[in-house]
Amino acid sequence: MKYDHLLVRYGELTLKGSNRKKFVNQLRNNVNKSLKGLDGFVVKGKRDRMYIELEDHADINEITYRLSKIFGIKSISPVLKVEKTIEAMSAAAIKFAQQFEENSTFKIDVKRADKNFPMDTYELQRELGGAILKHFDNISVNVKRPDHEIRVEVRLDAIYMYEEVVPGSGGLPVGTGGKTLLMLSGGIDSPVAGMEVMRRGVTIEAIHFHSPPFTSDQAKEKVIELTRILAERVGPIKLHIVPFTELQKQVNKVVHPRYTMTSTRRMMMRVADKLVHQIGALAIVNGENLGQVASQTLHSMYAINNVTSTPVLRPLLTYDKEEIIIKSKEIGTFETSIQPFEDCCTIFTPKNPVTEPNFDKVVQYESVFDFEEMINRAVENIETLEITSDYKTIKEQQTNQLINDFL
C-alpha cells in the first residue's frame, strides 16, 4: 500500500485549552528537528492533529520511527487522503482489502468529525463493506474480532483512511515545561528519571561527577553514551562533566567514615545548585528511589537536600526496582547502564554507611574544612559537551583521528 500522508495524533495537548497553540507549535518544531536529514515530506500542524504530507520517495518507515520517539505524540497512522465522495472512498477501501490474506475477516470503523457529511456512520460502513464484499469472494465481515480493521475519518477537508496505528511516546512536547539539571550517574536509575521528566515536556541538561584516576575513561564514555540515547528523542543535550576527585578525597579525609556517603552527595548537590543558576534551570532531577540504598532514606534525603533551595525532583521515588529495570530496557539504556565501570558513587563506599544521618553531625564534620573554594574550582573546571544522537565517543574520535593522520 502506497500511503500519501501520516496522521499524527497529539497526546495530552488536547487538555491544554487556550495554551494549545503554544504546545502545537513546540511539537511542530520538535518534529522538524527530529526529521532533520530526511526529505520528501511536508509537516502541517493543525489544532487537533498533525499531518505529514509524503512524496513518493519519502522513507515512511524511518519517518514513522522517529515520530514514535517524540514526546507529545500519542500515535501515528499511515493514511490515504481521499476525496469526500463514496466512489473515492469505495475505491480506497478496495485497495486496502487487496492486501488482506485469503479467508480473512474485516471491519469498517467510521468516525464523522464533519457532521454535515450527507451519509451517517452506519450508511458509510454498509457502503464501504459492501464494496469490498462485491469485489472479493474470499473475505468476510467480523465486527467483533476482525483480522483487519479499516478506519475511516470524515473530516472537514477530506476523508482519511488507514489500518495501522503505531503507538507514540505520549506525554507533552519537550520545551513546554522549563529546564532542569539531571544528575546522571551512569547507573540504571538516572537515565530513566531523565526520560520521565522529558516526557512531561521538560528540557534537560545533564551533570556527571568524574573522579579520575579512581573512575576510568570508560565510565565517562558510558555516561556520554547514555546521554546520546536520551538525545535520540529530544535532540542535542548538554552534558556537564565535573572534576570531582579533589572534593571527594577531601570529604574522605575530614568526614567520619559512616558519613562520607552523605557528605559526598551534599557536595554534589552544592555543585549542581551552582550550575543550575548558571544555566537557568528551575530544578534538579535525580534517580533516587526511596529506601533503595543507604543514601536514599528519608533521613538521608533531608540531610542532602538541606544544602540547596532548588527544588529536587525524584520521578522514580516510589518505583519498584523491577519497574525501573523494565523502563530502562524499554528506552534502550539498560545494556549501557549495566556495563561494569565504577562511577564516583561506588568508590570510597564505607562498609557501614549511616542510613539515618544526624543532620547536626554531618554539618559538624564538614565544618572543619571550608569546602566552598573547592566547590567553586570544580564548577569553574566543568567540561561541557553537546551530545547529539550521532555523537561519537572519545575513543571513536581518537581512532578516527589516528586513521586520518595515517592517511
Curated annotation (Swiss-Prot):
The keyword Coiled coil does not apply. Residues 61-165 form the THUMP domain. One of its GO terms (cellular component) is cytosol. It is found in: Cytoplasm. Keywords: ATP-binding, Cytoplasm, Nucleotide-binding, RNA-binding, Thiamine biosynthesis, Transferase, tRNA-binding. It catalyses: [ThiI sulfur-carrier protein]-S-sulfanyl-L-cysteine + a uridine in tRNA + 2 reduced [2Fe-2S]-[ferredoxin] + ATP + H(+) = [ThiI sulfur-carrier protein]-L-cysteine + a 4-thiouridine in tRNA + 2 oxidized [2Fe-2S]-[ferredoxin] + AMP + diphosphate; [ThiS sulfur-carrier protein]-C-terminal Gly-Gly-AMP + S-sulfanyl-L-cysteinyl-[cysteine desulfurase] + AH2 = [ThiS sulfur-carrier protein]-C-terminal-Gly-aminoethanethioate + L-cysteinyl-[cysteine desulfurase] + A + AMP + 2 H(+). SUPFAM superfamilies: Adenine nucleotide alpha hydrolases-like, THUMP domain-like. Its EC number is 2.8.1.4. ATP binds at residues 183-184, 208-209, 265, 287, 296. Pathway: Cofactor biosynthesis; thiamine diphosphate biosynthesis. It comes from the Bacteria. Pfam families: ThiI (PF02568), ThiI_fer (PF22025), THUMP (PF02926). It is an enzyme of class 2 (transferase). Disulfide bonds: none annotated. PROSITE patterns: THUMP (PS51165). GO terms for biological process: thiamine biosynthetic process; thiamine diphosphate biosynthetic process; thiazole biosynthetic process; tRNA 4-thiouridine biosynthesis. Catalyzes the ATP-dependent transfer of a sulfur to tRNA to produce 4-thiouridine in position 8 of tRNAs, which functions as a near-UV photosensor. Also catalyzes the transfer of sulfur to the sulfur carrier protein ThiS, forming ThiS-thiocarboxylate. This is a step in the synthesis of thiazole, in the thiamine biosynthesis pathway. The sulfur is donated as persulfide by IscS. Belongs to the ThiI family. This is Probable tRNA sulfurtransferase. The lineage of its organism: Bacteria, Bacillati, Bacillota, Bacilli, Bacillales.
